[in-house]
């Protein structure tokens, strides 16, 4: 069974959170989008750091999103307060614990799959929907089809449960960003 099939129910749940609906419909405001990017910075920093340490990004030098998320965040920065949601803090701690565990560190690929494949697919819709508030550099990919294929090549059969964990954290974060809903 593919990761897509294993996570299909959670992917649907993530897409149907109120926050995701706001993103996908273009009804998200600048402040909410900025705070979303702020939370993604914490998550992508951990995922990409552990992926780089293990060489998973060597064949995909254009895949890391951290710099482009930061550029989009700074474009919107007005000096007002942003916060990390409880789910983001929990997820960040989880990623660091997992990434530091020699027995489990390879599972970071499941989180790369959840976040980065989502950016390569659904992110293209989001880019159009946030164009009124952001340039959306985060969603700009060189050679996206090749990146999708390369990500698929590094995925292994033992990632199903961990991919579900990644989606569960994504759902929690989006619910936190919209007041727990």
Per-range role (PLM):
Residues 1-181:
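Metal- and O2-centered redox machinery and metal/ROS homeostasis
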